[in-house]
Amino acid sequence: MQISILEQSVSVEGKPQSNTIQDSINLAIKAEILGYKRFWVSEHHNHPTIIGSAPEVLMAAIASKTETIRIGSAGIMLPHYAPFKVAEQFRVLAALAPGRID
């Protein structure tokens, strides 16, 4: 059975947001070690505790620290972006981590 993780980068009060992002990256590393198939990141805006507002940036950071796990965005809020720009971002991600970006 193939198992994946959906990470929302939930911040804890009093904890620096940089730690939350690092925790998300560390979770992806552990998921890869444990044999998970895919690591999904989410996109949320204007939420007091979910700080995952730029999935393409977090995906690049995760790709740079892992080797085999597939990395995907659980959704892109296309009304906020030019679709061509999103396609270009994911093309760059695919070049950084060939065969691992969803």
Regions found by a protein language model. Give the residues of each.
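N-terminal beta1-alpha1-beta2 module of alpha/beta enzyme domains
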Residues: 1-72
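Generic, well-ordered alpha-helical segments
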Residues: 50-54, 78, 85
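A short, GP-enriched loop/loop-strand-helix hinge that lies immediately N-terminal to
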Residues: 70-74, 101-102
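Flexible, glycine-rich active-site loops centered on histidine and acidic residues
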Residues: 2-17, 80-102
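Active-site nucleophile and cofactor-binding loops and adjacent substrate-binding regions
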Residues: 73-81
